[in-house]
Amino acid sequence: MVKIDSIELPDFPLLLAPMEDVSDPPFRALCKENGADVVYTEFISSEGLIRDAAKSVMKLDIYEKERPVGIQIFGANIDSMLRSVEIVEKTNPDIIDINFGCPVKKVVSKGAGAGILKDIDLMVSLTEAMVKHTNLPITVKTRLGWDHDSIKIVEVAERLQDVGCKAISIHGRTRAQMYKGEADWRPITEVKNNPRMHIPVFGNGDVTTPKKAKEMRDVYGLDGAMIGRASIGYPWFFNEVKHYFKTGEHLAGPTISERTEMARRHLQMAIDWKGEHLGVVETRRHYTNYFKGIPHFKEHRLKMVTSDDPKDVFAAFDIVQETFGNAMIPEIG
């Protein structure tokens, strides 16, 4: 069993990563339904919460069925982060996660996200202040370091633990790498193998297949996997990993009919939550993966991603179901 503070999780839990414009309540709920053990919100600006910015506040919404859920916030000003904690607490999440890993320039330029990797003392002080300011468990998501020459993740993780961080998720790249090259899980294993570490250490980055997840568990010895891009438009990924763990066999993927029905549910949930316009527009990014590998699909996909009218998108789903039915997508490669 793995525990984040008092939250009990199964051995080697699978966590849905916080992803901007992806990890919203509808998608999180679908991932939870399909095997995710913990889900995290999109990252939320502490300054946006303080200003009561509509987009930031909307990200605080939680469905009861998706628990345990962590709300992730980012910022570099301790006072602003503490004020945002008070706002977050009112929505009753299970966990508050601090984003010390986002590599995007507009975040880093303000010293937030991965930008704080240039100031480890501030990173630790901010974490300590937040731990003291709330009774909710504080967790951290970060990267190996700012660049290859500044990787001190073993020391950093221990310092975060010592000020009260209850779990740490580490992406196996530096900020300088962004998302290029391959994630290196070896430094994450060094964190886990530090005899002074006793909080869960979760790996993140390039967990793209059930086999890779098993490698993270069995070869690298981590406590769990945080899964991001592999789940976009494919919430089945979590159950497929768990099936592979139990049997050593790959679970047959969903039929085209099942994929279409999931996409339909996803769109309807998004509309119910965000309204028609945002629901239609922001669900589009999932369709490539929902229907990846279907031959001669371009015409159907264009209808899904170009129409602003949900009736047209639902009609496109109907045509796909009528055309392909319960067929399986041909195995690629």
Protein language model annotation of sequence segments:
Residues M1-G333:
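Flavin-dependent oxidoreductase catalytic cores
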